[in-house]
Amino acid sequence: MDSAGQVNHRKQCDGKVSISDGAMSSGADIWKERERSRSPSQILRNELDSLRFYGKGNEKGMPLGDLLDEPDLLHKPKVNFCSPKTPWKRRLQTLAVAWHVGSFIYMAAFTLLAMANPLMWVVMIPYLLYYMVDRTPANGRVTRRYSNWFRSLALWQYYCNYYPIRLHKVADIPPTFTESKANDLGAKKYKMSLKIRLWPLKHSLTLNILKKSDAVEKEATGPRYIFGYHPHGVAALGAFGAFATEGCNWSELFPGIPVCLMTLINQFQIPFYRDYLLSLGITSVSRKNALKVLDQNFSICIVVGGAQEALTSKVGSADLVLKRRKGFVKLALETGKVGIVPCFAFGETDCYNILQTDEKSYLRRMQLWFKRTYGFTIPFFFARGVFNYDFGLIPFRRPINIVVGRPIYVDKKYENPSIEDIDYYQKLYIEELERIFHKYKEQFGYKGMELNYVE
């Protein structure tokens, strides 16, 4: 066999190494060359085949390419629009959800328009100066911006009734704040009182100035809490309704336990939107910030699975990223006098149709790059629109039932908690989470399903 034949023979027999013109190329180089040689239509088709569609009726997933090949899908006689006879309450519920889903876009657009209008500069320049120096989202001062009035707006009742979102209390949780003893001792109802004697009479006149709030003064006597919310779903819709608003009557079910929902710091980079979140008690999920909030006797809620769990979200699934998430347990040990409370939201993953990417697809790489660069990512999803039921970013009307479990108390403060201590409390946490899941799964439509820990 001559030298040219030997080269051709080696190209055919060796799948990993080929010799041509005296140079060696790895299997990865060959793969890249093949990728470049594919036509755009082939790449598009492979990407479609790598996407799996998860929705009602397709809980096990279906390749998107096969779904698009179905003749009924692309030849629907008409778009399924909302009926004009829809009750006005349902319309208001849809608008409340549309506001929440797109609120960051609306406020970002308002900011750009206000900056472009010279008439608004008298407002925008002082605000932007304040925006640049204010560190409230990261220094624990969200407790000063926490507005019970804003959290209690009727808007949030409409938001929660849309799905609906329901909170289920399965155990009594001692309140953090109880009525102060000063209330029983006839504490002054006014900030300033002036007593003037009407001489020469023995009578006097009392002038009361600046009446105090009618709210009963309270003091911190009980433990604080770290609520762990599972699963994340696409956007943790249930966590927002239950923990960031009074739409589910949080203060009635759990009186004396003010709670701050924690999210990524990126959301506080949009002017006005950051102040909107802070007034709802939403703050950043950094360790330093969480410790400061807990030090002020406020409880916190953490969506434990985070962005990584969002990528695994499927309709009707119970896939959790939890085994390797121990930071919230360590946070409880370092604080002391804290209860760790598992919460499971049945139906959180059912509100959107999901397009899940394959590990080797370009779309998956784009999602992971976005997560590495910006700290978060979201799956590809769709549901319905404001005026139609076929396509849009408004979630479906699917019930979300949030079961709040029993607290796992950490009485002692650990200066430097060991791995064994963290694992011990995490095990207790997982056991309680599994208990409430198995006890209530049949009641809320998860019969026959098991918790699946993907990480």
Language model region names:
Residues 2-75, 180, 292-455:
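Non-catalytic C-terminal accessory region of glycerolipid acyltransferases
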Residues 132-223:
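N-terminal signal-anchor transmembrane helix
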Residues 116, 147-151, 155, 195-208, ...:
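Alpha-helical membrane-targeting segments
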Residues 114-152, 157, 161, 168-176, ...:
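Hydrophobic transmembrane helical bundles of multi-pass organellar membrane proteins
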